Amino acid sequence: HDFSLVPPADTMLDVLQQAGKSTIGVGKIHDIFAGRGMTEFTYTSGNTDGLAKTLAYADKDFHGLCFVNLVDFDMLYGHRRNPDGYAAALQEFDSWLPGFLEKLGEDDCVIITADHGCDPGYRKHTDHTREYIPMIALGKKIRPVNLGTRAGFCDIAATVTELLGVPYQTPGRSFAAELV
């Protein structure tokens, strides 16, 4: 488990929960946010379990956010500098994704990203690495558009809350209008 400090202010999860939206954590999301802002959460034993649990949530009718952490990318392959394991995990995810996307509703949006760089091929240390992280938005009504380099995760929080119709004061700039 991660033993995080309580966030000093309301997070996106807090404001969504306060607005009556579902905030579902899969993996260690509950721990990352010190147990705050979750209406429901489930731990996972690794990526394969996380993908299965995420697919199960896609079958449920909820209005809100399902926030997923696939920990093996970081814990088993990134920090352990295991590029072969990382590649196999990416292939597993790539094989899983089409079945998940088929389950999405008309207005659903999926944002795929990472929380930091963790190059499995970098050998000087096992800490986080400094490359930019990818962010991909998908959904039946999501337009394919280059969003450029974003300021940070605050842009994702601004976008998610706007898409869910919940006001949230954040330094982030929503890119919802560019997507839908």
Task: Tell where the protein language model's regions lie, with residue ranges.
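Feature captures the catalytic ectodomains and active-site-proximal regions of enzymes
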Residues: 1-180
